[in-house]
């Protein structure tokens, strides 16, 4: 086998190096997770100042906002990977001819 192969056994790789490798492969997943944590943190902080709003309504709004951020990040990741795999090679291969 060649030495430049990307595969490595799970025992050889630590959690931090695995997280870094996966973040390089799909960078929008950590962005989605960070956005989710941010929205939930802000929602829990604002829970104290919700005035006369019901708790269930506040939690539903927080959940919808967090899901929206994650779905948006996943959608941007899919669009970026489609661009990288299909659109960019088509333009750069035509410019060389």
UniProtKB/Swiss-Prot annotation:
One of its GO terms (cellular component) is membrane. The chain crosses the membrane at residues 27-47, 59-79. Residues 1-92 form the HIG1 domain. Residues 1-26, 80-97 are cytoplasmic. One of its GO terms (biological process) is mitochondrial respirasome assembly. It comes from the Eukaryota. Keywords: Membrane, Transmembrane, Transmembrane helix. PROSITE patterns: HIG1 (PS51503). It holds the Pfam family HIG_1_N. It is found in: Membrane. The keyword Metal-binding does not apply. Residues 48-58 are extracellular. It is a multi-pass membrane protein. PANTHER family: HIG1 DOMAIN FAMILY MEMBER 1C, HYPOXIA-INDUCBILE GENE 1 HIG1 -RELATED. This is HIG1 domain family member 1C.
């Amino acid at each position: 086998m060649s030495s430049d192969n990307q595969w490595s056994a799970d025992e050889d790789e630590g959690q931090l190096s695995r997280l870094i490798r996966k973040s390089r492969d799909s960078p929008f997943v950590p962005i989605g997770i960070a956005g989710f944590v941010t929205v939930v943190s802000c929602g829990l902080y604002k829970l104290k100042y919700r005035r006369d709003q019901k708790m269930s309504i506040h939690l539903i709004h927080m959940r919808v906002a967090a899901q929206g951020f994650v779905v948006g990040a996943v959608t941007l990741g899919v669009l970026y990977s489609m661009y990288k795999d299909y659109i960019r090679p088509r333009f750069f291969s035509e410019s060389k001819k």
